[in-house]
Amino acid sequence: MESQVRQNFHKDCEAAINRQINLELYASYSYLSMAYYFDRDDVALPGFAHFFKHQSEEEREHAEKLMKQQNQRGGRIFLQDVKKPDRDEWGSGLDALECALQLEKNVNQSLLDLHKVCSEHNDPHMCDFLETHYLDEQVKSIKELGDWVTNLRRLGAPQNGMAEYLFDKHTLGK
């Protein structure tokens, strides 16, 4: 049945939103894997575990916000299989943060692509929604992760285990 509320909402935008929902859920799933990796007794970095758990929850919230927007615009949500994370072992804190940085850059590029599709189809509502709720937050997250990668390298990670311990305790543990 066709939506009664659908207005100026192109099928391409609807499909791109569904793809973005899947990517946000994949990011959430990946961060959840990282969180419980760092919670293991043989890794034991609770600051990293807490940070990645929070990131997982945030990415899931992003997916849910897109689903709500899809419904408000009269679109239909078509969930797809969520791909498993690229790995099960995340190595050092530095390795995981580098993976997180790449993941955030991929999510950001996908959001920019979604914005472009919506812009090409003259959908100011969706463009405003993305600009307000996603794009600025992504840039800030990328910058923060980049800074942390730089600081861990400066401290001698991953060769220096004390660097990761102190980073976990003083940067992520606050």
Swiss-Prot record:
Q: Which GO terms describe its biological process?
A: intracellular iron ion homeostasis; iron ion transport; negative regulation of ferroptosis
Tissue-level expression: Liver (at protein level).
Q: Write down the top EC class of this protein.
A: oxidoreductase
In short, the EC number is 1.16.3.1
Q: Which reaction does it catalyse?
A: 4 Fe(2+) + O2 + 4 H(+) = 4 Fe(3+) + 2 H2O
| Record domain Ferritin-like diiron: where | 7-156
Can you tell me which residues bind Fe cation 1? E24, E59, H62
Q: Which GO terms describe its molecular function?
A: ferric iron binding; ferrous iron binding; ferroxidase activity
Q: Listed GO cellular component terms? A: cytoplasm
> Which positions bind Fe cation 2?
E59, E104, Q138
Q: Which UniProt keywords apply?
A: Iron, Iron storage, Metal-binding, Oxidoreductase
Q: Does the keyword Iron apply?
A: yes
Q: What is the purpose of this protein?
A: Stores iron in a soluble, non-toxic, readily available form. Important for iron homeostasis. Has ferroxidase activity. Iron is taken up in the ferrous form and deposited as ferric hydroxides after oxidation. Also plays a role in delivery of iron to cells. Mediates iron uptake in capsule cells of the developing kidney. Delivery to lysosomes is mediated by the cargo receptor NCOA4 for autophagic degradation and release of iron.
Family of this protein: Belongs to the ferritin family.
* Record note on quaternary structure: In liver, forms a heteromer consisting of middle and heavy subunits. The functional molecule forms a roughly spherical shell with a diameter of 12 nm and contains a central cavity into which the insoluble mineral iron core is deposited.
Question: What is the protein name given in its UniProt record?
Answer: Ferritin, heavy subunit
Q: Which organism is it from?
A: Trematomus newnesi (Dusky notothen)
